[in-house]
């Protein structure tokens, strides 16, 4: 094992705290224009200045707990209809106008906005992509026969090359090619073909009670069993069994696919170099 690095913890304290008479449900930051987009549990979408908390704009939605996606001047949220998404476009700082609606024609399980494209997973095993500028469908992928059939989707993401799907169950992590619209790699394939490593955190001092985020240094140790072979439970530590993947995200700056489970984090390093060019062997790290 590599020796652990010298102990230190970076702490991020809130610069400001804003109180509201409504409970926030989903929050997205627009750092380039220094404001926050938020939905509330009561069904409101609003924007506010990040420094002063001044309310910039708001609109009421037809139902409680709306999910929100926001990126590059576009905003998408569910409007209460099981197969529809509302699309809004920013016309000036913090102010949006309705641009239309995406009507999938299938009950929506999850959706994710990246740039001007929204990815939708449906309860009847479809993965649909739309261009929010034209509201036109651009991709259709059938998830039947994969780990994600019967609506087994907990999170989705995408980039220029792939769609990423996470679900309940230890092997429910899938990479799908955007151009081919076919499965490019599954977690079962990764586990079967490549060695695994584990990460262990340093010990931390007792928290002081102030609200904060802590960025912890990690050091790698090799482990003979971190993710087990197919259809066996893999464990982070004795007695803790991984049950589902809660999120998946590609990090372009490091060519790493990051997946969050209910008991740990999985990194698949060099995954695009491997899938697109065959120029590197991927490394799996779980902690």
Label the predicted regions.
Residues 50, 123, 132, 168, ...:
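Surface loops and adjacent helix of pleckstrin homology
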Residues 1-57, 64, 83-95, 181-238, ...:
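Intrinsically disordered, low-complexity acidic/Ser/Thr/Pro-rich linker and tail segments
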Residues 104-205:
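Long, internal scaffold/assembly segments composed of regular secondary structure
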């Amino acid at each position: 094992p590599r020796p652990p690095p010298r102990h230190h913890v970076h702490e991020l304290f809130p610069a400001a705290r804003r109180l509201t008479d409504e409970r926030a449900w989903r929050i997205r930051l627009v750092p380039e224009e220094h404001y926050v987009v938020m939905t509330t549990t009561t069904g409101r979408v609003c924007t506010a200045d990040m420094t002063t908390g001044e309310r910039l704009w708001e609109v009421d939605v037809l139902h409680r707990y709306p999910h929100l996606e926001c990126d590059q001047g576009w905003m998408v949220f569910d409007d209460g209809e099981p197969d529809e998404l509302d699309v809004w476009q920013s016309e000036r700082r913090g102010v949006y106008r309705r641009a239309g609606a995406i009507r999938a024609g299938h009950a929506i399980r999850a959706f994710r906005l990246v740039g001007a494209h929204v990815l939708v997973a449906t309860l009847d095993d479809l993965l649909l992509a739309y261009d929010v500028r034209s509201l036109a469908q651009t991709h259709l992928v059938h998830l039947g026969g994969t780990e994600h059939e019967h609506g087994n989707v907990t999170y989705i993401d995408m980039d220029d090359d792939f769609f990423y799907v996470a679900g309940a169950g230890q092997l429910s992590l899938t990479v799908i090619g955007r151009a081919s619209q076919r499965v490019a790699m599954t977690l079962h394939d990764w586990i079967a073909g490549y060695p695994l490593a584990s990460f262990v955190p340093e010990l931390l001092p007792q928290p002081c009670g102030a609200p904060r985020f802590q960025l912890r240094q990690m050091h790698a140790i090799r482990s003979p069993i971190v993710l087990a072979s197919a259809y066996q439970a893999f464990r982070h530590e004795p007695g803790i069994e991984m049950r589902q993947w809660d999120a998946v995200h590609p990090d372009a700056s490091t060519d790493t696919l990051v997946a969050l489970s209910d008991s740990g984090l999985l990194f698949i390093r060099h995954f695009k170099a491997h899938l697109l060019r065959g120029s590197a062997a991927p490394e799996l790290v779980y902690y």
